[in-house]
């Protein structure tokens, strides 16, 4: 995976993310990725190498970006192109190529959430 040490996103990484994520990755959004900001899923910190890479980026509108940064929404990207959101009310959403799936706020949602983090067995 291509990674750079700067906050600015090189064109080759931008193209890779836009091809992977054709739409904004906020739950239930239908906005084209081409017109959105590319947001660092894990916020960028000066001096930490390799943070700007496709597996740490996703297209978000400014409004969704502000919701993530200041509005209580939590975001994780356990695999490139798979986005897990937690709303301020505790609801879980999984966003990927096939759209948004509401996973609720109960024990089952936690099981589904954790399933994306499991590594496949070797073999």
What are these regions (language model features)?
Residues 1-123:
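Short helix-coil boundary/hinge micro-motifs
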């Amino acid at each position: 995976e291509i990674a750079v040490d700067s906050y600015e996103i090189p064109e080759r990484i931008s193209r890779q993310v836009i091809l992977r994520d054709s739409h904004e990755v906020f739950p239930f959004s239908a906005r084209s990725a081409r017109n959105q900001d590319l947001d660092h899923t894990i916020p960028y910190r000066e001096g930490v190498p390799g943070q700007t890479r496709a597996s740490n980026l996703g297209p978000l509108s400014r409004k969704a970006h502000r919701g993530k940064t200041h509005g209580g929404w939590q975001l994780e990207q356990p695999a490139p192109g798979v986005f897990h959101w937690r709303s301020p009310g505790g609801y879980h959403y999984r966003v990927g190529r096939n759209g948004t799936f509401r996973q609720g706020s109960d024990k089952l949602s936690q099981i589904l959430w954790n399933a994306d983090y499991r590594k496949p067995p070797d073999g």
